[in-house]
Amino acid sequence: MRTALTVAGSDSGGGAGIQADLKSFAAVGVHGCSVITCVTAQNTRSVDSIFPLPVDEVTAQLRAVLSDFAIGAAKTGMLYSAEIVRAVADALEGSRFPIVVDPVMVATVGASLETRDLAAALSRQLLPRADLVTPNRYEAERLSGRRVRSLADARIAARRISSLGAGAVLVKGGHFRGELVDLLYHEGRFTEYRSYRYPKELHGSGCALGASITAFLTAGDPLRVAIERGRQRVAMGFATAYRAGHGVEIVNSHAIVDRHGIVRAVEDGAAVAARIIPLAWTPEVGVNLGYALPGATSLADVCALEGRIIRVGERLQATGPARFGASRHVARIILTAMRYDPRLRSAINLKYREKNRTRLKKMGFALGTFAREREPRGASTMEWGTEQAIRRLGRVPDVIADRGGVGKEAMMRILGEEPADVLRKVRRIVRGA
């Protein structure tokens, strides 16, 4: 079985560290080996004590694991001291598997998880061996030696950290203000990953991200694919976070979504939609119903009909099975909406008639609109239009409509938390028309 390794501290509360890493490995489907560097007494409110294991014991654990298991990728977390960094770097010398370094320095609850010489030791001894480094804003400051207050600062810091020898740098955006943007610097170019910012602190998010990326690398994914899939898993963990103690919530690092249930919900919903949608409301391009995974970040995370709901004689019929990645139109609307409200994971498209504008508002639906003729050249209509409607209204609307354009039908998209929610809105709109 494919095997991943985590070298990190033990969290007695189970929300971060070794415990979170192993849950993340298992959720992806790889076996997890662990090397414990420190034992911490902590919970969701505080870190009460840190006991670093003797360096010889850390080395013994590394030898035991590396001498027996074919490691596919490794991740380091809380290393705490220069001595432990040196031992880990020496043990990993010459290894051929990818190494992800999460330069843990401070806990979510604010406690320091390092000695003074940690950052220098990481820079000299471990980062040159790393395929990916995943610092947050404060860790990026320590490793780069410069203040990081903006995305522009993060770009400079990422270049500096990369110059220490790291193959790639992912500066996490959780500690910046404004829109959540993770910044990747890899092979001389930057990639920005944008997603919804949850208005709360969550325990274990950094561990879950690094471990998920490591698990996907172990499974054979290229680095960029592993990062994208890892971010999606963490977004799903945020969406399903839970409270176990009396302090901060815990990221659900072992979340496993019922993909079959989502497929079934789309197919069942499509059958209902074919019965309740009048022919006059059906666009020439057909109707599609989409439903995204929690925390979805890509088209592959959205399930929709392959063949849409189309007119067959004097009735509508759902054609083709539901499949993840089957839609572009509806999927882009859902993904854009989820960046602003991750609860809204489903949408359907219907023909729009201008006379419905007043009726929709009287029925209490929030209506957002956009004008296709104002779309910038090269933009994706559905992403740009959805974002325009959201920004103009100040929140995600129930219905997003446009009047069409040359060769384009006037269309409205009804959004909801799940297909059943969307179809409840469709019923109300149709009956009130």
Predicted features and spans:
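Conserved N-terminal subdomain of the carbohydrate kinase-like
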Residues: 1-6, 18-109, 253-257
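Short pre-catalytic strand/loop immediately N-terminal to key active-site residues, enriched for Gly-Thr
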Residues: 7-13, 190-203
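Short, small-residue alpha-helix embedded
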Residues: 19-24, 141-142, 200-223
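Phosphate-handling active-site elements
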Residues: 28-33, 191, 216-230
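Charged C-terminal helix
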Residues: 52, 225-281, 286-292
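Conserved phosphate/ATP/ADP-binding segment of small-molecule kinases
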Residues: 116-190
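Extended, low-hydrophobicity segments enriched in charged/polar residues
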Residues: 261-372
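C-terminal binding/interaction regions
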Residues: 354-433
